């Protein structure tokens, strides 16, 4: 999804939240997120085992719209730091998803190539970001989809078993007409992503 700063910009433009409250809201949101993580996130043997197995064959990176402190809390709580070769948070990039920057930087830092990089994404913006970066995309619906079997089968172009049907805008026969030239500046600034809404 969108980072907090982007969501606040949209609310500011719609005059639903005064701009002067942005800093206070972001601070409070970060405090609550850290509190929830510290209280509820615990070591998960399945997640640990997954990272352990994958790290024996592949380089693992984490790219997130979360802030660095939140990312590090999660890595520490799950005890997966030794399996992660690279991690990047929203504070380390200029352009948030759906811009491909976060994945392009991850690919370069892992000394990989887009075609050799698999991205697991559960958000629409994240999926656009991954595809724009040229990476292979494995869309997921929930944590249940993130299994060693699904990941390795996807890499080998075999059938994977997902917990639910994945919604996708991808369709070779779908044609989208966007009025005016380009993507529509007001549409982009409002925080929308492809496809452009016909009615607001």
Where are these regions (language model features)?
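A metal-dependent, Asp-based hydrolase signature
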Residues: 2-35
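N-terminal glycine-rich phosphate-binding loop and ensuing alpha1 helix
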Residues: 169-200
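Conserved SAM-binding loop
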Residues: 60-63, 95, 119-120, 199-200
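A general structural motif
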Residues: 57, 114-116, 171-173
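Structural beta-sheet core signal
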Residues: 62, 119, 139, 176-178
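Asp-based, Mg2+/Mn2+-dependent phosphohydrolase catalytic module
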Residues: 48, 68, 72-168
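Short, acidic loop-to-helix structural element flanking the phosphoryl-transfer center
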Residues: 35-62, 68, 72, 145
């Amino acid at each position: 999804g969108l980072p907090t700063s982007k969501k606040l910009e949209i609310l500011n433009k719609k005059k639903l939240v005064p701009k002067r409250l942005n800093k206070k809201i972001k601070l409070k949101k970060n405090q609550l997120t850290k509190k929830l993580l510290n209280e509820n996130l615990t070591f998960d043997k399945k997640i640990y085992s997954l990272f352990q197995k994958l790290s024996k064959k592949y380089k693992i990176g984490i790219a997130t719209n979360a802030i660095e402190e939140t990312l590090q809390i999660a890595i520490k709580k799950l005890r997966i730091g030794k399996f992660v070769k690279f991690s990047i948070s929203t504070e380390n990039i200029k352009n948030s998803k759906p811009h491909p920057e976060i994945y392009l930087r991850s690919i370069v830092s892992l000394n990989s190539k887009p075609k050799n990089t698999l991205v697991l994404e559960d958000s629409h913006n994240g999926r656009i970001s991954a595809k724009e970066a040229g990476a292979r995309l494995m869309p997921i619906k929930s944590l249940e989809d993130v299994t060693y079997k699904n990941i390795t089968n996807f890499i080998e172009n075999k059938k994977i078993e997902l917990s639910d049907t994945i919604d996708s805008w991808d369709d070779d026969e779908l044609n989208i007409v966007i009025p005016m030239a380009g993507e529509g500046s007001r549409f982009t600034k409002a925080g929308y992503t492809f496809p452009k809404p016909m009615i607001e």
